[in-house]
Amino acid sequence: MSRYGRYGGETKVYVGNLGTGAGKGELERAFSYYGPLRTVWIARNPPGFAFVEFEDPRDAEDAVRGLDGKVICGSRVRVELSTGMPRRSRFDRPPARRPFDPNDRCYECGEKGHYAYDCHRYSRRRRSRSRSRSHSRSRGRRYSRSRSRSRGRRSRSASPRRSRSVSLRRSRSASLRRSRSGSIKGSRSRSRSRSRSRSLSRPRSSRSKSRSPSPKRSRSPSGSPRRSASPERVD
């Protein structure tokens, strides 16, 4: 059923500041004095409040006027309509504000004539704090986002880069080993051929030196007489 009566008003009433030992029967007796009731519901977890619903919204308004601030179930209760603008109880009024004194000083700047919440320095501080907080939050968000993105990129690019670098290193080391072994073998063969050629050339040179003909002896004219080729004929 609707909580609004035929006159269009609110039929449910909120009851606050109830004690933990509040009973349903005592609430029904207190509120049924103003009119017939539909339901009475008491909160248990957490305790301390209840809802009473009337059949007529005018009875609900009368109960709010008559029972607000009264002692029910051993405690002074607060009674108001459950929706709309709540009716303030005389026990829930805020404390009266201190009257303005021109001789009072502001504890922010030490000047007279205003309080801290009206001070221009206090308003500047609040603005700077809010700006610094928003700036630090945006910085933290940007840093966390960029860090997470860089981590994802690193994790994605790390495995192919590592595999490529490992394969390149292996191929380079193998080629270097091959070239080094080939150069060592070539140098060894060259040194051996050079040593052999040297060993062979040495005795040949000595032999050639020993076999070289001795210098020709020059025959003096006083030597043995030359033989004439043919005797002269006498006619």
Swiss-Prot record:
Its main location: nucleus. The modification N6-acetyllysine is found at residue 24. It is found in: Nucleus; Cytoplasm. One of its GO terms (molecular function) is mRNA binding. Residues 81-98 are annotated as: Sufficient for interaction with NXF1. One of its GO terms (cellular component) is nuclear speck. One of its GO terms (biological process) is negative regulation of mRNA splicing, via spliceosome. Extensively phosphorylated on serine residues in the RS domain. Required for pre-mRNA splicing. Represses the splicing of MAPT/Tau exon 10. May function as export adapter involved in mRNA nuclear export such as of histone H2A. Binds mRNA which is thought to be transferred to the NXF1-NXT1 heterodimer for export (TAP/NXF1 pathway); enhances NXF1-NXT1 RNA-binding activity. RNA-binding is semi-sequence specific. This is Serine/arginine-rich splicing factor 7. The gene is SRSF7.
